[in-house]
Amino acid sequence: MTDYVLESRCCGTKFADEKWELDCPNRDGAALIFANYAKKQLEVKENLPGLYKYSDWLPVCRTLDGSGAPVTYKSEGLAGELGLSDLYITFNGYWPEKGALMKTGAFKECEAYAVCARINDLNDKVMVVASAGNTARAFARVCSENNIPLLLCIPQDCIDAMWSAKPLNPCVKLVATERGSDYFDAIYLSNIICELDKFYPEGGAKNVARRDGMGTTVLSAVTTIGRIPDYYFQAVGSGTGAIAAWEANKRFIVDGRYGNNLMKLMVSQNIPFTPMYDAWKAGSRALLPVDDTVARKQAEEICANRKPPYSLKGGLFDALTETGGDMFAISNEEAMEGMVLFERTEGIDIEPAAGVAVASLKQAIRTGAVETDAVIMLNITGGGIAKFKKENKVVYKQPDCVFALDTDPDTIKETVMELFI
């Protein structure tokens, strides 16, 4: 079991992780809590499976079967194409030839294996996860293979993301919000369900295990490169992964063996839904006002989060500000070009979000926002799915129930209770 305490970014209160803590006991409100680990220098434990080799900086009390870890390597193909001398790619997905064994094809597995191994006194209840698709697929795999009761809430339009190599354990149930809904609607549904005593929220960005699981991408990169990178590139839907990268970076500064710089967070959003980009470029901590109907439609198109952890203390605005980072807006055409470029130069298929990150790196080079001799970490958040599906027959999980957006909360509660009888 990892030795750590939780700490509030707002008031500095330190407290034990006893009851699936998601907030400071002082109820600071708009602030993230974080894990303060007793071991300040990271020891990579190669004798532990997958992700858990980084357990010194993961809030876990056990290991689970089946995890894979991010894999970092120095690029030759893409780096040569872009004229970069020190480009390192951190690959999350399925690419056995590189040692990447995430069978859902995305770094959401890093979150799921960390969250499900966290101290939990609620094991007799059902964890609820709201997702736009990839996170749900990852949690479904982890919980199915480790017999952990789980209820997933996703927009029905994202149902194609719910594939797996084999049928899911009956302990995993799936409910969806009707077509035309988005991730925020799935979150709203999950909140209604969590009013029932039988269910508890996974927590999203507020869950320290989710963020520190994501942060293993940086642990992989820094321990492979031997120093903290100068720049960090990633596409973001909610910004949680970039927040996690910032937090991991600061732990390495305390570690003292890898440098004392903060890598500049260079994060990107996919046009047309760019609320964080718009706020950042306007110099605003608060997200800018937008018509709810327009936001719903745009977010639905790319399965994005209308209410990201951008403004709160310790959120993406603070991370970008402290690191001197920047944001990019990338079109679908640019993202597709990024996907094609990566597969041509590196030899593996990547997901659209990763294509957005590649496109943002191209844009940054073109505009002179980064130096060609800088040490750059490119976080490929998903890849190898086409390869996995070619090598394996997959099955799709259909919703156990689909709810209209105007469904009465009591009806929702009665329906989901029946799923776990």
Please describe what each predicted stretch is.
Residues 1-421:
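PLP-dependent amino-acid enzyme catalytic core
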